From Swiss-Prot:
Keyword Transcription regulation: no
Compartments where located: Membrane
Modification Phosphoserine occurs at: 26
Species lineage: Eukaryota, Metazoa, Chordata, Craniata, Vertebrata
Gene name, Swiss-Prot/TrEMBL: STUM
InterPro entries tied to this protein: SPEC3/Stum
Matching Pfam families: Spec3 (PF15795)
Membrane-topology annotation of the record: Multi-pass membrane protein
Protein name, per record: Protein stum homolog
Record's keyword annotation contains Membrane: yes
Species per Swiss-Prot/TrEMBL record: Homo sapiens (Human)
Transmembrane segments: 51-71, 87-107
Superkingdom of origin: Eukaryota
Length: 141
């Protein structure tokens, strides 16, 4: 396949830019960009738990879909923090119960089981990130 005329022009333009820039083709100035994940209400209701509890919930979610999420709902009642600070504790509790029910009911078609495992992984990731924040260690994920 022969390169088209447009491809040749693009390559020539890139070569001209690279020759004009002594640092190479890239002209980035080292700007730091911060990205924040926008979470839905169910995802934001996942509590920040201690690491061992999060691992137990992941284990439970792996073998009995929704059970770890159900257990994590009760950690909200015990004071676990979530990303929904403006919602009442009971509302966050019921959001977690709803997530557990969704996982249980859709486990029949494997969707709930996979969702349950990912939910447990999110619990562990949140527990790890919370541990880093408490210790003041810079975090790289």
């Amino acid at each position: 396949m022969e390169p088209s005329h447009k491809d040749a022009e693009t390559a020539a333009a890139a070569a001209a830019v690279a020759a004009a820039d002594p640092r190479g083709a890239s002209s980035s100035s080292g700007v730091v960009v911060q990205v924040r994940e926008k979470k839905g209400p169910l995802r934001a209701a996942i509590p920040y738990m201690p690491f061992p509890v999060a691992v137990i919930c992941l284990f439970l979610n792996t073998f009995v879909p929704g059970l770890g999420t159900f257990v994590s709902a009760f950690t909200v009642l015990c004071g676990a923090r979530t990303d929904l600070p403006d919602r009442h504790v009971c509302c966050v509790f019921w959001l977690n119960i709803a997530a557990a029910l969704i996982q249980i009911l859709t486990a029949i078609v494997m969707v709930g089981w996979i969702m349950s495992i990912f939910w447990g992984m999110d619990m562990v990731i949140l527990a790890i990130s919370q541990g880093y924040k408490e210790q003041g260690i810079p975090q790289q994920l």
